[in-house]
Structure formats: C-alpha cells, structure tokens
C-alpha cells in the first residue's frame, strides 16, 4: 500500500507517483525524499524488546506485536495520509528480565542516544512529525525523556504511543478489551492471556501451549493486603520479573486463543490508523514559540 506525501513533481519527471511509494522508510529510494511533502509526513519509529516471556513464548514477543499492530493498521490508512514506518528497534531496555536466559538489553543512556540519533536523522530529512510507537512496558519512561528533548532542541512534533494503551473497540464500537477479565488486565501484564493470544494469532508455531498455565503474580498478594501500596497507582515497585513469578510470566496464558488475539490486533490497528490521521489534522500552531507577556 502506497502513500501520498509528495509535493508537486515536475512534468516528465522520472520520480515515482505518490501511489507507488511504499509505507516503509527503508523501502524508499534516496531521490524520493526530494519530493516528499516533509511538512506533513509522519515518521513512526517502532521500539520493542527481545526478552524472556515465560516458558511458553519466544523472546521476540514485543517485536512481533508492534510489527503486527502496524500490519493491522496499514489497510486502514488512507493513501492521502503521509506516514512512513521506520525500521523496528528490536532490542530495548529490559534489565528487569536479565535473570532469565536469552534476554537482550541496552543501558538507558544507550537507548536514549540511539532513539535520539535516529530522530535527528529523520529531522535532517525534513520530516517534522515523529511518533515513538512502543510495545514494551519497561521503557515507557525513556520515551518521554527522548520525546521532550527532541521537542525542545529540534522543534519536532513528537508523540509517545504505547500500543497496549490504544483504544480496544471493534468496527461497531463494542469493547474488545472485555474479552479479558479486569483481573487479567491488571495482573496479567507479561506473557499472560493477552500477549499469548496475540502471539497465537501472529506466530502460533512459536507458542508452546503445553507449557502455558495460569501464572500467579505476587502483585495480587500485595493488592489484597495493602490498600495504598497495592492499589497499582500510588507506589511503583522497582521490580525484577522473578519478584512477580519464578517462571517469568504472569496471567492466565492457558486461557489464550488466536481468536482473541486477532480481535485485539485488529482493534489496535484501527486505533493506530485513526491516531495517525488525527496527528495529520493537527493545526500548524500546535507547537508554539514563547512570547513575552
């Protein structure tokens, strides 16, 4: 599926037509950038993780999920919507999973520098809008640090977007999130029913349901004992995954189905496409200069 974010091209030009351009940054040719309507184009940087996800899921879960959400969004993007998806940054910030074999992680300062330098390269191409699309809960704070710095230094319009916070409704507006219990939404935060369902929809051959179970979280124990410490909002534990469950997973993975996962992916894809459309419609004065009173 192509996009239309070209300026008017000269007559008899060998440059591609708007509809012929791909959606992925790396698939463009260098001369294409000379005719991009860079003031409208939205660059999307997917950031994920390579980390353990219990005994039943592969290390690539977060990377697979963010790319699956993008794929689900593509059919809902208008050809008039100028969006370019940058290469997925698969390795992220995952120190909370380092006690489990296979986890790859970078230091916080490395991640900040990496994402910042990629954004600087995007800005050097003339693009003025950037979305940091994240699928890993352990690096949410780093997105905000990078986004605010880019706004302050480069004047970029930057949005931090976490795929797991996108609205979850079907085409009729009914809740897709209701497939899962409130308990699962709160405590099944890693390799539980939600992520396992999505992986069954995307890469079923990599899911070992024989090893999936209802993985208990010690977070539930604290919630039952402490009214403030356990409310999930007032205080945040600096945790390692084994603090929650020795298997490195929490939530009822045994209840996962591909059907639930497909519905989630479609809902996230629709929401992402709508979000990008809304960013495109923002007024030019969304970012403003300071003025003296």
Language-model-derived ranges and their functions:
Residues 6-129, 137-293:
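Extended, histidine- and acidic-residue-enriched regions that form the cofactor-binding/catalytic faces
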Residues 132:
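Conserved SAM-binding loop
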